[in-house]
């Protein structure tokens, strides 16, 4: 650390940060990586291999605050002291996606939304691959965009974007932008103000041109109002559960067919043939089909991809049937709206495992579904007081668990033949688990050990 002035300082040494460091070095920039926590061995080994200087367990301000530009990993809040100091010194702060976008002319398909973005990203990636395109998968899934731009470039990218990534994007342009929905989530990062969170999501349309496309859920009142008040310059391609206007591009007709119009040849497909069930997956399928049609993918390839796609892990993932009881892993449901969609898709009585780190949740949204479908609740978390306050007296069987082993054991005892045990926590996982993947993996392990 003898050189104190770097062109780029990367904060955070996960996939996003290390990818950004690799690209910065490949472009001849002097780069330094700083992580306040511990760097995973595989990333430390990579930084050593490329001789990129780094630190862990601290943020050395003397180095960071002398940088020409900072690339901030999405997990670091703007309230972090080092970020506040950098802003005060007027040091530019960008996301890894923004940085990577400077070094590629690839066609960018970007997906955001409070729920469904991983499924839609993977479904669209699957569709484009099936159509024969050379496409990279980036953002919150796959390898970082920066890493791919540096060492494995593609002419097309499908990118899942969180609101945190969109916050630090300024010049990046999405050729196709998809906004699936906006519901309260991560409000702790937005001063508990929904409008600030929603504005971050709408940044996906920033820098779009008339030849670009903006695909959005027309049934969402906030999105529709925003589009009316701030008309994007891109071509508008909305989808809805039924045709609302002449401009509606995709909907479900009276024959229960998914219809896409206004894009070259019409596309019609029986919704029963879709690989994934549930109302939310009809939305995801419509967005996928519109994007593929907008990119001139043939109907055959779209139809095939919509039929044979396999769902992503931790999203309504069926683990096993044990003594006539289905066990479903929906650990990726980290907000109430995701849990609403999971419950809506259930066809049996449910034992529901809820809880974790609350992000300002309002459980009123799932109350009716819980009352009509749930026979037992298991609260999995260190602090379940808010859940008890809301649900006590409404469901007769409620239990607390402080480990996944205990939660699955309780669910096993509560469930009857024909029921479904559903892990759909509606909360973040950081009180008891490393992340939602760890939570889902532990659920899978415990179920398979029954």
UniProtKB/Swiss-Prot annotation:
Gene3D superfamilies: Mur ligase, C-terminal domain (3.90.190.20), Mur-like, catalytic domain (3.40.1190.10), NAD(P)-binding Rossmann-like Domain (3.40.50.720)
Sorted UniProt keywords: ATP-binding, Cell cycle, Cell division, Cell shape, Cell wall biogenesis/degradation, Cytoplasm, Ligase, Nucleotide-binding, Peptidoglycan synthesis
One GO molecular-function entry: ATP binding
Uppermost EC category: ligase
Binding site for ATP: 113-119
InterPro entries the UniProt entry points to: Mur-like_cat_sf (IPR036565), Mur_ligase_C (IPR004101), Mur_ligase_C_dom_sf (IPR036615), Mur_ligase_cen (IPR013221), MurD (IPR005762)
Protein name: UDP-N-acetylmuramoylalanine--D-glutamate ligase
UniProt source species: Porphyromonas gingivalis (strain ATCC 33277 / DSM 20709 / CIP 103683 / JCM 12257 / NCTC 11834 / 2561)
């Amino acid at each position: 650390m003898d050189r104190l002035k770097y062109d780029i300082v990367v904060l955070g040494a996960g996939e996003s940060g290390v990818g950004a460091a690799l690209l910065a070095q490949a472009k001849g920039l002097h780069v330094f990586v700083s992580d306040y926590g511990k760097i995973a061995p595989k990333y430390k080994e990579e930084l050593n291999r490329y001789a990129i200087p780094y630190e862990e367990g601290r943020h050395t301000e003397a180095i960071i605050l002398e940088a020409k530009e900072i690339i901030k990993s999405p997990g670091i809040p703007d309230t972090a002291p080092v970020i506040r100091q950098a802003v005060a010194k007027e040091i530019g702060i960008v996301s890894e996606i923004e940085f990577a976008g400077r070094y590629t002319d690839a066609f960018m398909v970007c997906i955001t939304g409070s729920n469904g973005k991983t499924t839609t990203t993977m479904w669209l990636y699957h569709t484009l691959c099936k159509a024969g395109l050379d496409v990279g998968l980036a953002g919150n899934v796959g390898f970082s965009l920066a890493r791919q731009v540096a060492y494995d470039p593609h002419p097309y990218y499908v990118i899942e974007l969180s609101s945190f990534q969109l916050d630090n994007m300024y010049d990046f342009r999405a050729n196709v932008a998809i906004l699936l929905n906006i519901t309260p989530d991560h409000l702790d990062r937005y001063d508990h103000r929904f409008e600030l969170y929603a504005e971050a999501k709408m940044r996906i349309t920033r820098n779009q041109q008339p030849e670009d496309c903006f695909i959005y859920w027309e049934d969402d009142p906030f999105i529709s109002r925003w589009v009316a008040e701030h008309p994007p310059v891109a071509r508008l391609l909305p989808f809805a559960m039924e045709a609302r206007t002449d401009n509606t591009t995709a909907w479900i007709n009276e024959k229960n067919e998914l219809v896409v119009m206004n894009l070259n040849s019409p596309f019609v497909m029986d919704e029963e043939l879709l690989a994934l069930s549930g109302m939310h997956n009809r939305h995801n399928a419509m967005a996928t089909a519109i994007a593929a049609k907008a990119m001139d993918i043939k109907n055959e390839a779209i139809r095939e991809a919509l039929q044979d796609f396999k769902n992503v892990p931790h999203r309504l993932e069926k683990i096993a049937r044990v003594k006539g009881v289905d066990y479903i892993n929906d650990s990726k449901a980290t907000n109430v709206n995701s849990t609403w969609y999971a419950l809506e898709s259930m066809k049996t009585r449910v034992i529901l495992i809820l809880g974790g780190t609350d992000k300002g949740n309002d459980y009123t949204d799932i109350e009716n579904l819980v009352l009509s479908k749930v026979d037992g609740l298991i609260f999995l978390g260190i602090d379940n007081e808010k859940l008890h306050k809301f649900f006590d007296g409404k469901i007769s069987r409620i239990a607390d668990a402080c480990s996944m082993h205990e939660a699955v054991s309780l669910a096993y005892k509560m469930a009857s033949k024909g029921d479904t045990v559903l892990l759909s926590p509606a909360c973040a996982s950081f009180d008891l688990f490393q992340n939602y993947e760890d939570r889902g993996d532990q659920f899978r392990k415990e179920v398979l050990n029954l």
